[in-house]
Amino acid sequence: NVRLGAMLNLTFLSRNGNHKYQLKNIFNQLATSRYTWREGVDAQSNDEHSAEYSYRSRTTYNGQLTGKHTFTSDALDWSIGYAYANRHLPDRRRYLLNDIQNPGEIALHTGNDISREWTQLDEHIVSLGANDKHSFSFGSWQPSLQMGGYGEYRTRTYNTRAFYYQWNPSICTLPSDFQQGDVTRLLSDEANMGYDRLYMFEQMQMRNNYRAHNLMGAGYAAVDLPLGKLGVHAGVRFEHNDMELISNSRDTEKSESSRHYRTNDFFPSLNTTYKFNDRHQMRFSYGRSINRPEFREVSPSVYYDFDLASDVQGNTELRSCYIDNIDLRYEFYPSRGESISLAAFYKHFDSPIEWTYTVAGGTNLIYSYKNAQSANNYGLELDIRKNLGFIGLPDFSWSFNGALIKSRVEFAKGSKEENRPMQGQSPYLVNTGFFYKNAKQQLDIALLYNRIGKRIIGVGRSEGSAASDDNARVPHSYEMPRNTIDLSVSKKWGEHWELKLSVRDLLAERVYYKQFA
C-alpha cells in the first residue's frame, strides 16, 4: 500500500472577531498492489486453485469554503463544498484451475478460466448549507431558535470492460500441455498467441455499466428550552431526495433506461437533559433517521469479488430503511476528564437493508442486498473514562466501552424465513484502551483493544429444497469473534511539526467465516 496525503487550510478573521472565513482542502491518494492465491473447495465441491493480480488506485479530494458570523442575537454559519472521488482497477487479472473434468487433476479447461478486467468509477459532489441560531432573552429565561437548510447534488459514472482468453475457435478445448502448464509462462510466451492459438476477446457486458445522480434538499427548525434543571432540545427536519439510476437493459449495445427513487420525509428529534447537580445528570433522546440505498446497492451491475469467490449484484427493488432510536442514559462525572455512563437503548428498523447471498444458476452463489420486513435492537451500553493518577500514574488514563445487544429480524407469518439476528449486528461489543499523554514532552501513546461477537455477514435462505437448484436451502454465513490490538504514537516538535506512527492489528489473528448447517 502507498498513501499520499495533502492538506491546506486558510483562515481569515475580521478585526472585531465577529466574522470568520475558512478555506479547507484535503487530498488523499491510495494505491494498493495485491497478489492473492487461494486453494480450497468451490460451491460445487470441486477442488480449486485460483489467483488474482490487482492494482487499485483511489483518489479523494474534499474542499469547503465556510463562514461564521456573530451578531447581537444571531449566530450564522454557511458552507459551500465540492468533493471528488475515483476508484480505478486497471487490468485486474484472474485465473482458475479446478478438477471439474478429472477429479483430483487440477487444470485449466477453457480460456474463460483466464480473465482481465478494467473498471473505472468517478464521482462528484457539490453541496451548499446554511444555519442560523437566534437567541431570545426574557429576563433570566434565554431560549433559542435554530433554522437551516442543506442541498447536495451527487453524480457518478461506473464503467467496466472484461476480456477473456480463448483458444482456436475451431477447437475451443485447450491442448493438454496448456491445461497442465504454468499459467504465467503460458501467457508470457508470445509464441502461444495468435488467431489460431490463444487470443483475447472482449465479452460485452453493457449492463454492468451505469450512471447515477442524486439530488437532496433539506430544511430544519429546532428550539432549545432551558427549564431550570431540565434542558429540552426539540426539532424537525424535512428531506426531499431524488436518486436516478441510468443503466443498460442489453449487454451488446447501449440501451439506457432511467429509474427514479424519490422520498419526502419528516424526521423529528427530541433530546432532554435533567441535571441533578454538576456531577450527575440523566438524558433521554428520541430521533428518526433514514438509511437510503447506495448507487451500487440498486444497480444491476455484477462484479466478481475474489475474496468472497462470488458475484456481487445490486437489487433494483431495494427500498429505504427508516430507523426510530430511543436512548435513556445516566451520566456521572467524578472529576475533570473522567466520566461514567450507563445507557439503555432501543432501535426499530422498518425495511432494514441486509447483505444476503443465495444460489443462482444451480450451484453458483451470488451476493446481493435485500429488505427485511422489520427488525428491533435493544440493549445496554457502559462507557468509562478514568485517569490513573490514583495509582501513581497521572499521565495515564483508561477507557472502556461495552455493549450487550439483542437483535431480532421479524418476518411475516407464513414466510419461509425464520426470525433471526439482524445481518451485521453482534450480540456484544468490547472496546478498551490505555492512553499516555505527556504535555511537556508533547508525546501521546494509545493502545487499543477491540472484540466483537459472532455476527451474520451473509443472510442465506432458512427453508428450501435439499437439491442443487435455485430454491436450495442456504445456511447463513457468520463472521466469528476476533481480537484486535492497535498501537499509535504521536510526537510533536513545537507548533508546526508532528510525527505519527500507527500499527494496526498487532495480533494478526485469522479471520474465520463459518456456516452451520
Task: Specify the residue positions occupied by each region the protein language model found.
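Transmembrane beta-barrel wall of Gram-negative outer-membrane proteins
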Residues: N1-Y35, R58-L65, T72, P268-L270
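Short loop/turn motifs that connect adjacent beta-strands in outer-membrane beta-barrel proteins
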Residues: R15-K20, T72-A75, S135-S144, T160, ...
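Transmembrane beta-strands of outer-membrane beta-barrel proteins
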Residues: H19-L23, L76-I80, P143-G149, V232-V236, ...
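Transmembrane beta-strands of outer-membrane beta-barrel pores
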Residues: F27-A31, F71, Y82-H88, Q120, ...
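Signature of Gram-negative outer-membrane beta-barrel scaffolds
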Residues: L30-A31, S115, V126, N131-R279, ...
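Outer-membrane beta-barrel signature, preferentially recognizing the C-terminal barrel domain
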Residues: E48-T66, M204-G217, I290-F349, A360-N387, ...
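Gram-negative outer-membrane beta-barrel transporters
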Residues: F345-F349, I366-V459
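C-terminal beta-signal and adjacent terminal beta-strands/loops
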Residues: D350, R451-S468, S490-A517
